[in-house]
Amino acid sequence: MPASNFPTGVHDMRLGVIADDFTGATDIAGFLVGNGLRTIQLNGVPADDLAVDADAVVISLKARSCPTGQAIAESLAALKWLQKNNCQQFFFKYCSTFDSTPKGNIGPVTDALLEALGEEFTVICPALPVNGRTIYNGYLFVNGVLLSETGMRNHPVTPMTDSNIMRVMESQSRGRAGNISSTIVDQGSDAVRDALRKLQSEGIRYAVLDALNDQHIETLGRAVSQMKLVTGGSGLADGMARAWTQLRGKNVAAAEAAGAPVKGRTVILSGSCSQMTNAQVAAYKAKAPALAMDVEKAINDAAYIDVLAEWVLAQSGDALPPLVYATMPPEALKAVQERFGGERASAAIEDLFGQLAKRLEAEGFTRFIVAGGETSGAVTQALAIDGFTIGPQIAPGVPWVRGIGKPLSLALKSGNFGTEAFFFEAQKIANQEGDK
């Protein structure tokens, strides 16, 4: 692909991404910026007259667990906007743990996008080896363990009980799935392209790509660089971005500069119940002020928001910012779901986190570290942030982002991302890379 094909402005965007949740959007945006692509994240489908000057635009939706018809409609609206802005290639982004049951939305949305683009074939690749998500013979692993044997089997919204991505994909879509094995990927991008053509000629609609390591990601990125529609996690997008920037060079510092964290007070809000977030909360509350959200009060007490806000404001003298969390281990989560109902409890918690973020913004807080995709969506919407510029990475797939037109910075973390020290690391990066 010649270097002259790369964009210089809104009329020639390289890549348009449709992400099925907020943290997934910042995840992929962080990898694109990390390869030197100027990237903007827009929260929801923007107005028709919005002008954007970027190499890549990521549109974040809340389409992972909503009704299928809504997910399709919103995804097609995002595609239409990207097409109107002369986007050259399209990427449907979902989680590296796939997060989609047999009644899930990944298959239906993929089918709708293929049909809208007049295409018959695409790839499926949630792999993100740098975070331990690998695919072997079409099976998805997390740190060497089958996905269905990890904590994802207990996910409150999208429990993953089958690790075979081909089988999951076929259960919720209109076509057949095949596999490009790691032995083929080892042979290079030309071999992968040949194998993709063979699968398509056999009537396969979705090619699940094996990826065991970083070299595989780079090979796959080159192999799919000309496909009209690509679907996957941020790993494949990272490989694609590397292929593009090898041709034109990259300036990561310049790409990150627009999203440098603002100065100001910080709060941590954690709604994820993943294994890693439980470990992160435990590590942080051992050294910093932390308050567990009372689920019953979140549901039944309208004045509980005042209690939470007053507690956060009272921690201003502490060396480390305060943490408010609804994070809990699986057995406690199960008890909450049985007592209150999973959807009812989740909705109340998300709403309360949104209210709290809005209240703290009014009190002068400018940095929000948020754990959990649903929580991140609630906080972003409550803060009325329509889009982000993408800043420095805290951990693979988790950058600092800065509100467009608002002096607010957020770190929006998918549940299982980051190390146990993530909450500390996010603050360190903000203090080092923030506005001088």
From Swiss-Prot:
Disulfide bonds: none annotated. Its EC number is 2.7.1.217. It comes from the Bacteria. It is an enzyme of class 2 (transferase). Keywords: ATP-binding, Carbohydrate metabolism, Kinase, Nucleotide-binding, Transferase. Pfam families: NBD_C, SBD_N. InterPro entries: 4-carb_acid_sugar_kinase_N, 4-carb_acid_sugar_kinase_N_sf, NBD_C, NBD_C_sf, OtnK. Catalyzes the ATP-dependent phosphorylation of 3-oxo-tetronate to 3-oxo-tetronate 4-phosphate. This is 3-oxo-tetronate kinase. It comes from Brucella melitensis biotype 1 (strain ATCC 23456 / CCUG 17765 / NCTC 10094 / 16M).
